[in-house]
Amino acid sequence: MGKIKELETSLANKIAAGEVVERPSSVVKELLENAIDAQATEINIEVEQSGVSSIRVVDNGTGIAQEDLGLVFHRHATSKIVADDDLFHIRTLGFRGEALASISSVAKVTLKTCTDNENGHEIYAENGKIIHQKPAKAKKGTDIQVDSLFYNTPARLKYIKSLYTELGKITDIVNRMAMSHPEIRISLVSDGKKLLSTNGSGRTNEVMAEIYGMKVAKDLVHISGDTSDYHLEGFVAKPEHSRSNKHYISIFINGRYIKNFVLNKAILEGYHTLLTIGRFPICYINIQMDPILVDVNVHPTKLEVRLSKEDQLYDLIVTKIREAFKDKILIPQNDLNHASKKNKVLETFEQQKINFEKQQSQIGETSAPYVHDQKDKNHDVESHKNNLDSTSSTNNESTEVSNELHNHIDDSYLQSQKEVLFDMEQNTSNEYEISNQQSNDIKGTVSQTPHRRVPYMEIVGQVHGTYIIAQNENGMFMIDQHAAQERIKYEYFREKIGEVTNEVQNLLIPLTFHFSKDEQMIIDQYKDELDKVGVHLEHFGGHDYIVNSYPVWFPKEEAEEIIKDMIELVLKHKSVDVKKIREDAAIMMSCKKSIKANHYLKNNEMADLIDQLREAEDPFTCPHGRPIIINFSNYELEKLFKRVM
């Protein structure tokens, strides 16, 4: 008798379900996608015990016809594709017909549905089989309840992390879906606590205000652009709101949340020197394209996709993000009361914390944006209401957020797009204005230059030979003198190095390099890559190589180190990025040739430095992304000294 046997349907379904239903958030994702595909305008999600006990998703979409109910829990039964060619023109979020079959294989599922022309029906399934089907009262749309997840696969429960972590992953999914579909009213409730409620206004920035808080939302900058194949829309937050991981980067293609290394790299390249190493932006990028240019049928979770013309999209993202910040004032507002505010927010959060039985795990920063940033949102909205002496109750928070956004409108975008967005730079044109007479009366000040992003300021002095202190009518400024000159010199060296061709400089004494046998084989294979950039390696016997010349733009004292870096790139990536090498060289030279800490300057030298900084293309961060200027507002100074409460 043969050893190979066909698995029973129930066992095969459980195995297949492992690919689709990894955890409670997987169930929420699949049901939410189905509701969106059903053209719902309102979706309500309720979970208990982070979805382990129950998950309920109610929508007002088209509903499921009675004649189709018998197939809803069958594997590969779908209304979204019919022929092979449909796979290359997918515009729906779901298409495989696996979700409900997989969920019903590992949970108890009750589905109520009603269409426009029929009465309601209820169907109940467990262990992948329909137990009963009957008429039932139901509103138009679909109501799905998933109970006792993994009840028949207890081994899977062992891999469920803390309830806080699982809730974080659920809120992450819901938040991202809400951002990509702002026209849908979406609410999320966990154990009776409302975690998210969007108003369905169609404005993504209002959804981001709900998720990240008003402080971040007011510093969002709109981006938009087109190529022959792609249309790009999105919001990018100012660098001061950066985070310590990539979790806050949200990329969507045709409304589908995806993860893509190349597009992530494009976003970081767009911010370029505005972010320090290890910091990542908050951003929302939505890309519309012909479905034939993207393959979403790569992975069961549909998170990974393959893109055509990826380079074109990369360049578009980089260009639009750089353009977004080109004319913006990016001086971070220092919060002198950050510590006390943080403590108050933490206290508030502790009081509102969801009561999970016997759960003591902490929320990590990698949990959902809601869990991480809701604290800031609660505080920001509350403090803003206090500033306006608002009498609105906290129950109207969604209305409060929506109303606040309408007070910050970018008129130019309103005219072109007929949408309401934030005025990302409200009053920046006159925020730092000062009369010509005042400018002439002040000695030892930096001259005012029109159309420059660095504001007028009067030099006051220097602290520890490191930080320049300046002031204007709006407050006090601290300038890192090393970072300021580093930015100035970086832009100078970047331009000069960029102008130089691959003309080489011959050496009297060659540089010698030794490699292992494995490295030697790679270098011999890819030596042409080094030749293209002016580094000519010659075999010198054994495992030794010599270099008799290198490009004239190499800094003489760093030439050997740069060549080593190039060779490392060849060994690791089988290629050399000349642009990056030149960039790194400019950064290296600017850092070494800039004034250091504990270097005391005269007032006129400080003024000259600020004047030069004003002429810089990006005057707010050094090449490594560290801030150059920090602003202390008059209000914050007065608050520090208890002059205001």
Swiss-Prot record:
Matches recorded under PROSITE patterns: DNA_MISMATCH_REPAIR_1
Family matches, as SMART domains: DNA_mis_repair (SM01340), MutL_C (SM00853)
InterPro entries: DNA_mismatch_repair_CS (IPR014762), DNA_mismatch_repair_MutL (IPR020667), DNA_mismatch_S5_2-like (IPR013507), HATPase_C_sf (IPR036890), MutL/Mlh/PMS (IPR002099), MutL/Mlh/Pms-like (IPR038973), MutL_C (IPR014790), MutL_C_dimsub (IPR042120)
Keyword Nuclease: no
Record GO terms (molecular function): ATP binding; ATP hydrolysis activity; ATP-dependent DNA damage sensor activity; mismatched DNA binding
Region feature Disordered, mapped onto this chain: 371-403
Alphabetized UniProt keyword annotations: DNA damage, DNA repair
Entries under SUPFAM superfamilies matching the protein: ATPase domain of HSP90 chaperone/DNA topoisomerase II/histidine kinase, DNA mismatch repair protein MutL, Ribosomal protein S5 domain 2-like
Function: This protein is involved in the repair of mismatches in DNA. It is required for dam-dependent methyl-directed DNA mismatch repair. May act as a 'molecular matchmaker', a protein that promotes the formation of a stable complex between two or more DNA-binding proteins in an ATP-dependent manner without itself being part of a final effector complex.
PANTHER family from the UniProt entry: DNA MISMATCH REPAIR PROTEIN MLH, PMS, MUTL, DNA MISMATCH REPAIR PROTEIN MLH1
Family (UniProt): Belongs to the DNA mismatch repair MutL/HexB family.
Identification of the protein by name: DNA mismatch repair protein MutL
